[in-house]
Amino acid sequence: MKTTINQVYKHVGEEVTIGAWVANKRSSGKIAFLQLRDGTGFIQGVVVKAEVEESIFQTAKSVTQETSLYIKGIVKEDERSPLGYELAVTDIEVIHEATDYPITPKEHGTEFLMDHRHLWLRSKRQHAIMKIRNEIIRATYEFFNNEGFVKVDPPILTGSAPEGTTELFATKYFDEDAYLSQSGQLYMEAAAMALGKVFSFGPTFRAEKSKTKRHLIEFWMIEPEMAFVEFEENLQVQENYVSFIVQSVLKNCKIELNTLGRDTSKLEQIKAPFPRITYDEAIEFLKEKGFDDIEWGDDFGAPHETAIAEHYDKPVFITRYPTSLKPFYMQPASDREDVVLCADLIAPEGYGEIIGGSERIHDMELLESRLKEHGLDSDAYKWYAELRKYGSVPHSGFGLGLERTVAWISGAPHVRETIPFPRLLNRLYP
């Protein structure tokens, strides 16, 4: 019976056939141990010389790393295995013998591994991170579908920048200039006026010359927008969503978290509601902690975010930032025009901001005024401003960076491990 590694639990005591690759091997005299992977998981195949034909045992001893094969054996329970099962091998059929596989079971430098990213993905650690990434994506769709959101796909080629920044990848669009999207937010606001509650999931591109462990040039974002939703309700959606995906990973990725050595006790504490502090309170807190490099009106750096997050040891919202620090589309607070109704969600354990969100401006005159203040071409944003002309309502939204979220939940030290083929400063290969 042909099966996959993640389904062997259904076949205890039965003989099965699995198509797999040899991840590693070792032998001790009359027994050979093959670490096998098939994309769904890892299992150990045990080949006992006295129980198989001599040719099969010799194949098991000589088979090379990453050789592909069909392997037949009897599924047995094994408490020592992370999977809980092993395969008592009865037959091996080599499909293709791999030679000189470059990523041997020794330590390799980061640049070497990045040059061989197409092969590094096969490792047990990278496999675990990709499975966690997949579970976060799956749980994202489940959460927003359950909450009545409609999936909308904004364009990747745009004629303007949502953030109003210069960190854009430009290209020619026939006789016009176009840019790779930094965010689908403006289009999602239009969709929310048609469909009520919407979300998008797609790639974004930022030409930031940054080499930190938190930054990628190309990354994926989840961007919900909601009509008739004001600031506080927006925060509630965010904390419920983050709590949901964390609990989903804890439930469905136990083997992967164990493979990564992730301390799940910290993740188990991630449940809504999350603490909230204002920007003013954050500045005061940092000064009390001895940070003398920040004043009101300054943005937070990684050390500042880490200090704040460590104090709470769970995700924390920093709210009501100065207007001068944020994009043009954010709604000002009713009691203070110098701050806006926005929040950044800071992940614990030093992973920094994973969500940025706000209530959006819904008054057309105010929006047009903000566009002028930011020096933006009003003609390029005419369609966006027009959303406030025909039945405008309070509305809010946010964007969650997938790779930073994967890094936090999986415990990865750098976001380059959280996307299959990372695009970094000075790295476009493979």
From Swiss-Prot:
The answer on whether this UniProt entry bears the keyword Metal-binding reads no
Q: Which reaction does it catalyse?
A: tRNA(Asn) + L-asparagine + ATP = L-asparaginyl-tRNA(Asn) + AMP + diphosphate + H(+)
Q: Which Gene3D superfamilies match?
A: Bira Bifunctional Protein, Domain 2, Nucleic acid-binding proteins
Q: Which domain of life is it from?
A: Bacteria
Instruction: Name one matching Pfam family.
Output: tRNA_anti-codon
- Which InterPro entries does the annotation name? Aa-tRNA-synt_II, aa-tRNA-synth_II, aa-tRNA-synth_II/BPL/LPL, Asn-tRNA-ligase, Asp/Asn-tRNA-synth_IIb, NA-bd_OB-fold, NA-bd_OB_tRNA
Where is it mostly found?
A: cytoplasm
Reported EC number(s) for this entry are 6.1.1.22
- GO MF terms held by the record: asparagine-tRNA ligase activity; ATP binding; catalytic activity, acting on a protein; nucleic acid binding; transferase activity
Q: Which GO terms describe its biological process?
A: asparaginyl-tRNA aminoacylation
The cellular component terms of Gene Ontology attached to this UniProt record, alphabetical and capped at eight, are: cytoplasm
Q: Which keywords describe this protein according to UniProt?
A: Aminoacyl-tRNA synthetase, ATP-binding, Cytoplasm, Ligase, Nucleotide-binding, Protein biosynthesis
Q: Which residues form a coiled coil?
A: none
The first-level EC class reads ligase
Q: Output the CDD domains linked to this UniProt entry.
A: AsnRS_cyto_like_N (cd04323), AsxRS_core (cd00776)
Subcellular location field: Cytoplasm
Q: Which family does it belong to?
A: Belongs to the class-II aminoacyl-tRNA synthetase family.
How the protein assembles, per its UniProt entry? Homodimer.
What NCBIfam families would the database entry show? asnS, PRK03932.1, PRK05159.1
Q: What is this protein called?
A: Asparagine--tRNA ligase
